[in-house]
Amino acid sequence: MEVVAEGVETPDCLAWLRQAGCDTVQGFLFARPMPAAAFVGFVNQWRNTTMNANEPSTSCCVCCKEIPLDAAFTPEGAEYVEHFCGLECYQRFQARASTATETSVKPDACDSPPSG
């Protein structure tokens, strides 16, 4: 049986569900409610990103700009970012975290170059 959890809002909740054996999750941690007209574009962005994750022309920011910084550093978040966008994108999150720590400001993931 496949288990789906709805209403996942925090990285802690996501970690608990993963430990409990939950197969799939959805919730505000990944996307907020949106108008129907915006949904088509949202789905197309995800589909294109998933299909083109290894192409250099695909911007990591297409799929992960909505991921909160703290969510990107959970085991699940890291796995998600690396799966859909690759290691370079995860390195952008690391650079973003470093910048946020140094300045106490959370810049957009797109603003920071990959580290390394």
Swiss-Prot record:
It comes from the Bacteria. It comes from Escherichia coli. Residues 1-47 form the EAL domain. Pfam families: DUF3330, EAL. The keyword Repressor applies. InterPro entries: Cyclic-di-GMP_PDE-like, EAL_dom, EAL_sf, TnpM. Disulfide bonds: none annotated. GO terms for molecular function: cyclic-guanylate-specific phosphodiesterase activity. Keywords: Activator, Repressor, Transcription, Transcription regulation, Transposable element. PROSITE patterns: EAL. The gene is tnpM. This is Transposon Tn21 modulator protein. This protein enhances the Tn21 transposition by activating expression of the transposase gene and decreases the resolution of the cointegrated DNA by suppressing expression of the resolvase gene. SUPFAM superfamilies: EAL domain-like.
